[in-house]
């Protein structure tokens, strides 16, 4: 990649160091990863020479020859030159001549466009190639399809001249340990890709420097001291950038510099030194210091802004290209924990014990037998826009407070009086946030004062923890909201943006604010909710210190970088009051770390605390031995200041990744909601001679238990998420680029052409004819010659749709067979339905075992039946990939909602971790929601016959109650009271109809399968409405014979079950003659 100051080189090295870090964290894992990757190392016992061996994806082992960096290959006279070198040097020379030839007014815009073109070619072009190579092996497949590396002597290479040219070019560059004919295709493809990278990166850096030259000038009125300082700082940054690049290349060599692990894997010692110990992703962070040094020397805002654009584009390259490949290649999810025989025995013994889960709604998870010593699993996090929940009082209060502060800030004038009030308010809230919270944490650390307060009133430690998180969050919101309000009051728009350093101050201030946001995001990413809210002050346990993320390089990043934003506000406002607030904030934050955090950490972790961070160690190693002994405060301040610069980019990556990922997800959702429509108006010429009757599709899947038959055909209803096998039939001369896709029946109105994008839900019929591998996932067999019903030979094959190639919803779908990579439809399958069977609520008697039995196959389908993540039993833990990829939990949440009518958040599925825990949660939710299940749809909906029976019974009971009330009650108040009690019984009849049988006694009721007491209080308006309805029912009853009415008065009254029979009436003791309460 880039040498010297070039911008992009950093990627490969940086990403590789990140991978090494992940592997080095566990030596056994690292060794296993190397062994699994086939990385072999052979050393000569008599010399220091070491040969490197690589392994291709198909297992081929080969010797990786030694190569040289780009700059030395191009510019060193000792290195052999070839045609590609001449072309690159000629293009670079053309750039220089263009700068000399262009007139002055055209130099800046022309070279701005040229540089942006090469930057786009780097970040977008190379990024697209590497992304497809990582996911689909696109570059290697291109080489296989064109056969450019096949020896022409075999008569299989259609480009013999190109073959000879490539052979001469590559062997000239690598004179030893390399044979063009014997090298694997992956390595040769990588060598050709390197030449393209050399061209793009050299042109990228050269055009940037020429653009800076075109923009450079000497500011009018600048003093000599300022000029010397500007150039000195710029030269230092450029030299530092040069050292970063050279040291990075020394560590990772050309293999990672040119993204070699996208093509093959080699042996690589897990070294972690040099620049990679100073900063994360140094090629993306400090590796761009030279750009800002050149901006200083050019004294041009144009160069500064285009440098910022280039830097941001490089971070996007890291987020979308490097990091996904790193995670896929070097950080696969750990294997799922399998249940041992002892665990299964203990689990089964627990299952045989009497279950009391159905009798209590406050019981914890089934496995819990002792109070938890640690915090509850973080399911509903507090921080982040994604976790905003207006049903939660903390979130609602935070929004209302911010709206109130905003309204007061905007609606009040910016007079000195109001400015003083807002600054004083910000200072008070900073004192509350630092001193007040610090005092509470100190008391909690010493004597658990916060937890004891809640225990005194019968609450649990978990409740104390939740209340603490809300208190800390609200105080933090008020602290920063009041500070922003004070900044708003003290800020005035500049009259002239070009005057002095006004624009520079705003740019630097915005950069510092962004730095604090990135720092906070990185700290939260490393610590999580538990660490962010100081969870180790509240829960004691075997806590283990881990220095990952930003803490790998800094011990206390919030000490400097965490307050960068307040100093950015100082730069933007140039206000003494804001400077006072910034100093106050910084002093209080340092005091908080020194007097609150540090004592608790020393008490909790003792000698396991790290003394020096990675950056400090690296700086100490560069000092002479005499200076290494000095550990004064001056050294600390210097180290912390240097760490500030290092942490800038470290914290930038995760925040930028989160923001860009959110943007991509939103855009993807829009495209899915409004899919692009492709209209094909002409029929391909190669369709001539093909008969669509020779094509056919048959589908097989896991039948749902709710199959229906209509006429002679049985409706095709498949289980949610189950793989669907498609058998296709085509003529022997069918195109090898045919493909089968899955659509909703309503997606396409035409049966000749598919006009809607398949959105990735398609599988090719034959392997090796597309440039990606995703479309080949699912191919079982291809071009099996069989005889059809007309005794003609046809080609058949099978493909299977599973995972992301399915629709994870309910509906009616169809498969379509398309011709030659186009959208012409040759065959359409029978429509089939994907349905989630509704759980039978009549058999739902808090029977957790039945819920587990119904839920297990659904969960396995949602997890793609992958043995690494899908559980085999209800007790088995979910695989760790469920935690990483949220799509699996979302599938389960949708299925649970459709099956049981209970809506969970995806975090609940990840937190439960087993089918048994999830089933328990469903049962518990059903018990809690049982009193509110008076719906007119679903399994509990009464039929028309039931409603008639209910109306008849209700009328008889109401009439009897009114007669008793008139005879026995002597006052209107007592009549109304008694009527309320008995009408409660009548009104509650519908609520309990889902149960098998419900008996009602005087003034109380006890459902046969519910622990909820009845009657439930009913509003007076409902009683009045029922009273009016009772009068109508009474009128109907009066038409009956008086004898029947008297008989009903003396008889007991009972409520009927769902299918009432004459024998199902049970007698209640008559209330006549009894004393009424």
Curated annotation (Swiss-Prot):
Gene3D superfamilies found in the cross-reference section: 2.60.40.2840
Membrane-protein topology: Multi-pass membrane protein
The protein's Enzyme Commission number: 2.1.1.17
Gene Ontology terms for molecular function: phosphatidylethanolamine N-methyltransferase activity
Known catalytic reactions: a 1,2-diacyl-sn-glycero-3-phosphoethanolamine + S-adenosyl-L-methionine = a 1,2-diacyl-sn-glycero-3-phospho-N-methylethanolamine + S-adenosyl-L-homocysteine + H(+)
Side of membrane Cytoplasmic, spans: 107-109, 217-223, 299-300, 414-419, 504-506, 597-1077
UniProt keyword list: Endoplasmic reticulum, Lipid biosynthesis, Lipid metabolism, Membrane, Methyltransferase, Phospholipid biosynthesis, Phospholipid metabolism, S-adenosyl-L-methionine, Transferase, Transmembrane, Transmembrane helix
Record-annotated membrane-spanning stretches: 86-106, 110-130, 196-216, 224-244, 278-298, 301-321, 393-413, 420-440, 483-503, 507-527, 576-596
Pathway where this protein functions: Phospholipid metabolism; phosphatidylcholine biosynthesis
Compartment list: Endoplasmic reticulum membrane
Recorded GO CC terms: cortical endoplasmic reticulum; endoplasmic reticulum membrane; perinuclear endoplasmic reticulum
Function: Catalyzes the first step of the methylation pathway of phosphatidylcholine biosynthesis, the SAM-dependent methylation of phosphatidylethanolamine (PE) to phosphatidylmonomethylethanolamine (PMME).
UniProt protein name: Phosphatidylethanolamine N-methyltransferase
Annotated organism of origin: Aspergillus niger (strain ATCC MYA-4892 / CBS 513.88 / FGSC A1513)
């Amino acid at each position: 990649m880039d040498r010297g100051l070039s911008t992009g080189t950093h990627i490969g090295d940086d990403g590789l160091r990140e991978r090494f870090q992940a592997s080095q964290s566990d030596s056994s894992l690292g060794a296993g990863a190397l062994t699994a990757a086939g990385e072999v190392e052979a050393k000569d016992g008599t010399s220091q020479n070491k040969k490197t061996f690589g392994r291709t994806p198909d297992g081929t082992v080969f010797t990786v020859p030694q190569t040289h960096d780009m700059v030395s290959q191009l510019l060193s006279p000792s290195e052999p030159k070839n045609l590609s070198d001449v072309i690159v040097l000629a293009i670079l020379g053309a750039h220089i001549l263009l700068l000399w030839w262009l007139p002055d007014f055209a130099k800046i815009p022309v070279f701005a466009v040229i540089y942006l073109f090469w930057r786009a070619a780097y970040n977008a072009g190379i990024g697209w190639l590497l992304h497809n190579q990582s996911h689909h092996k696109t570059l290697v497949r291109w080489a296989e399809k064109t056969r450019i590396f096949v020896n022409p002597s075999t008569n299989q290479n259609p480009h013999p001249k190109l073959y000879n040219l490539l052979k001469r070019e590559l062997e000239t560059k690598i004179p030893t340990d390399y044979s063009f004919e014997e090298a694997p295709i992956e390595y040769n493809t990588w060598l050709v890709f390197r030449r393209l990278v050399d061209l793009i990166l050299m042109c990228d850096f050269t055009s940037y420097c020429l653009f800076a030259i075109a923009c450079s000038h000497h500011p009018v009125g600048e003093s000599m001291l300022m000029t010397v300082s500007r150039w000195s700082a710029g030269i230092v940054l450029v030299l530092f950038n040069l050292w970063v690049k050279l040291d990075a290349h020394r560590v990772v060599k050309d293999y990672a510099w040119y993204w070699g692990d996208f093509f093959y894997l080699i042996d690589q010692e897990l070294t972690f030194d040099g620049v990679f110990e100073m900063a994360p992703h140094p090629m993306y962070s400090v590796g761009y210091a030279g750009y800002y040094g050149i901006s200083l020397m050019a004294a041009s805002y144009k160069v500064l802004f285009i440098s910022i654009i280039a830097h941001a584009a490089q971070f996007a390259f890291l987020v979308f290209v490097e990091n996904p490949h790193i995670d896929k290649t070097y950080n696969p999810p750990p294997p799922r924990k399998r249940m041992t025989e002892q665990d299964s025995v203990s689990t089964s013994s627990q299952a045989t014990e009497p279950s009391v889960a159905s009798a209590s709604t406050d019981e914890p998870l089934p496995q819990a037998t002792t109070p938890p010593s640690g915090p509850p699993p973080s399911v509903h996090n507090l921080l982040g826009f994604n976790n905003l929940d207006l049903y939660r009082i903390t979130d609602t209060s935070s929004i209302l407070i911010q709206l109130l502060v905003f309204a007061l800030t905007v609606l009040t004038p910016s007079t000195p009086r109001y400015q003083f009030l807002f600054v004083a308010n910000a200072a008070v809230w900073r004192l509350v946030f630092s001193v007040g919270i610090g005092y509470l944490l100190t008391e909690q650390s010493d004597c658990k004062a916060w937890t004891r307060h809640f225990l005194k009133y019968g609450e649990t430690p978990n409740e104390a923890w939740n209340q603490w998180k809300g208190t800390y969050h609200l105080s933090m919101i008020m602290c920063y909201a009041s500070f922003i309000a004070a900044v708003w009051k003290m800020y005035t728009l500049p009259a002239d943006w070009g005057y002095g350093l006004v624009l520079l101050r705003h740019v630097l201030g915005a950069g510092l604010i962004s730095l604090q946001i990135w720092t906070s995001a990185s700290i939260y990413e490393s610590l999580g909710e538990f660490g962010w809210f100081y969870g180790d002050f509240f829960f004691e346990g075997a806590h283990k210190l881990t220095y990952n993320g930003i803490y790998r390089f800094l011990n206390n990043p919030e000490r400097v970088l965490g307050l960068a934003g307040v100093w950015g506000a100082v730069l933007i406002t140039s206000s003494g009051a804001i400077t006072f607030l910034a100093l106050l904030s910084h002093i209080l934050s340092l005091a908080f770390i020194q007097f609150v955090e540090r004592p608790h950490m020393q008490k909790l972790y003792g000698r396991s605390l790290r003394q020096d961070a990675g950056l400090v160690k690296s700086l100490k190693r560069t000092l002479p031995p005499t200076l290494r002994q000095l550990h004064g405060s001056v050294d600390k301040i210097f180290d912390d200041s240097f760490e500030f610069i290092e942490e800038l980019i470290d914290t930038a990556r995760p925040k930028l990744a989160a923001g860009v990922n959110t943007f991509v997800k939103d855009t993807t959702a829009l495209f899915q909601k409004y899919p692009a429509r492709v209209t094909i108006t002409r029929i391909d010429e190669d369709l001539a001679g093909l008969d669509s009757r020779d094509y056919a599709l048959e589908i097989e899947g896991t039948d749902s238990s709710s199959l229906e038959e209509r006429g002679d055909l049985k409706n095709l209803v498949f289980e949610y998420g189950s793989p669907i096998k498609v058998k296709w039939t085509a003529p022997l001369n069918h195109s090898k680029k045919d493909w089968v896709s899955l659509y909703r029946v309503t997606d396409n109105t035409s049966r000749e052409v598919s006009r809607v994008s398949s959105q990735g839900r398609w599988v090719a019929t034959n392997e090796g004819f597309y440039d990606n591998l995703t479309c080949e996932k699912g191919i079982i067999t291809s071009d099996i010659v069989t005889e059809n019903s007309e005794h003609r030979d046809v080609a058949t094959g099978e493909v299977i749709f599973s995972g992301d190639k399915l629709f994870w919803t309910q509906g009616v779908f169809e498969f379509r067979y398309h011709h030659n990579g186009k959208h012409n439809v040759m065959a359409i399958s029978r429509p089939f339905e994907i349905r989630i069977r509704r759980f039978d609520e009549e058999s739902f008697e808090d029977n957790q075992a039945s819920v587990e039995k119904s839920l297990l196959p659904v969960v396995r389908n949602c997890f793609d039946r992958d043995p690494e993540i899908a559980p085999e039993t209800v007790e088995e833990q979910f695989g760790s990939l469920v935690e990483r990829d949220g799509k699996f939990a979302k599938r389960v949440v949708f299925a649970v909602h459709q099956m049981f009518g209970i809506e969970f958040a995806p975090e609940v599925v990840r937190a439960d971790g087993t089918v048994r825990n999830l089933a328990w949660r469903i049962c518990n939710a059903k018990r809690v929601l049982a009193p509110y299940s008076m719906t007119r749809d679903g399994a509990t909906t009464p039929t028309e016959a039931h409603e008639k029976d209910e109306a008849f019974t209700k009328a008889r009971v109401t009439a009897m109650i009114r007669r008793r009330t008139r005879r026995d009650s002597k006052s209107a108040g007592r009549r109304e009271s008694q009527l309320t009690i008995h009408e409660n019984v009548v009104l509650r009849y519908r609520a309990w109809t889902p149960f098998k049988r419900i008996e009602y006694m005087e003034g109380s009721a006890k459902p046969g399968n519910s622990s909820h007491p009845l009657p439930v209080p009913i509003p007076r308006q409902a009683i009045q409405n029922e009273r009016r309805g009772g009068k109508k029912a009474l009128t109907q009853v009066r038409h009956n014979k008086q004898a029947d009415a008297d008989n009903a008065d003396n008889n007991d009254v009972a409520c009927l079950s769902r299918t009432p029979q004459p024998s199902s009436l049970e007698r209640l003791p008559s209330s006549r003659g009894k004393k009424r309460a």
